[in-house]
């Protein structure tokens, strides 16, 4: 049994996750000693939880397009780890989108998993929850400012806006993103996946 399987069992045994474990819903994350990139998003969506595939929706299609890689490579490579801020679908919010990831979840499990991935080059931080946790006081005053200043976080972290169709307006207002941030993302991906 690998260390990642042991951690998975610990997560399932944690009382914080008992409702999921009782309903036979395992945590959704992917970790590997060969991982060079870690993608940290908010939490699995309903479809991801049902299909057991991260980013298995329109947001994932856009993310893979931004990265410049195929769906097959995205799911098959051990060089990409997936550590959402919560490993379980938190439910639908009253407004658009999903309920935020549970407080304390990433703090408890991410350090244990990251410690076991010695080859990590860059942690890709998708959305404000991931950015606030990993960048903490180094974050800008809002997501736009944090992402605009992406170069100051490299090479350890790369903040991205969420690739959701709900963010099309943001992308139109911030055209610098696809001209500056996406090329930087592709350089990182090429260096770590395709060499």
Placement of each model-derived feature along the sequence:
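A polyanion-binding, active-site-adjacent surface
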Residues: 1-193
